[in-house]
Amino acid sequence: MATPTPSSSFSQWWRDYRAILTLAALFAVFPFILPYTALANEIMLFALAAAAFDLCLGYAGVMMFCQASFFGLGVYAAALTLLHLTSNLFAAIGLGVLASASLAIVIGFMATTRSGSYSVLLTLAFAEMIYFIAFQWSGLTGGDNGLTGIKRPNLEIPGFFSINLQSSLAYYFFSFVFFIAAFYIIRRITLSPFGKVLMAVRENEQRAQAIGYNTRLYKMLVFVIGGIFMGLAGALYCMYICFAHIHYVHFEISGNIVMMVLTGGMGTLFGPVMGAFIIVLASDLASALWDRWMLIMGGLFIFFVLFARGGLWGLFEKLLKMRPARGKKN
């Protein structure tokens, strides 16, 4: 039996990781080529939220409309931590993630008691309830005025180093580290045996149950994992804008994340990142040019749903497959 050579091992490693390395390189240059750093930061953090939702919908077939609840709770938990508990950067991020994960456990437990449209409607009901609580409990959330006075902490390890994160660019690259690490973890999940079971549940839940898998448990787990990473995106976003508002628990955020996944191509992981780039960038440019810019976004979404169901990533893969075919003819 032939043993793998170092060169073949390296080739395999490169095939496995070149997409993530390319993704990291692209996001590393975004702040320098986009009009302003805030736009690059928004694209990156919504790309993380979209990738987390793609794990739920694209890989497990779990549809939900409570993405904004996880993202927004991450925003609020980080904001309240910095305002009332501590100025520790990692504590704010950790509590944002913990709050969203806790909510995901509750919603996931309830939503997985039903299937199909009933499960989706339960997530929508929870999302509306969270929004109503945030709106009415103005003493805690600031209501329609939001929470202001949030100060972005610096990155400090006592006795080792301190990095000033007040610069938008410095904070972008701080978030960039979390983004790449989180994306890598999500990708490894999709390639793991756990990820294979999720895909089996997506394709045929009854068959997965018949061979012994507890499909409800797997769907609950993917709810929690998705909630963790959406909460992480929300916590990082809060410390960038230094503001928390009920807009971030509004259904519009959930709708935007769904659009990002379907536009980019669900079940691809890289597609939703591409979708986030297109949706956030197009929203920013179109809103500056036309008051009715949402019509453009709606038209774009309809086009991809009707004529390009594989999304942008599907179109990209088709173009790549066409290149060798042309080479063979020559």
Show the residue positions of the predicted features.
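Hydrophobic alpha-helical transmembrane segments
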Residues: 17-21, 40-44, 69-72, 90-98, ...
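Cytosolic-side transmembrane-helix boundaries in multi-pass membrane proteins
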Residues: 1-28, 146, 196, 203-205, ...
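Membrane-embedded helix boundary and interhelical linker motif in transport proteins
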Residues: 59-109, 157, 161-165, 285
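Transmembrane alpha-helical segments in multi-pass inner-membrane proteins
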Residues: 68, 219-307
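Residue-level recognition of pore/gate-forming positions within transmembrane alpha-helices
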Residues: 27, 46-47, 75-76, 97-101, ...
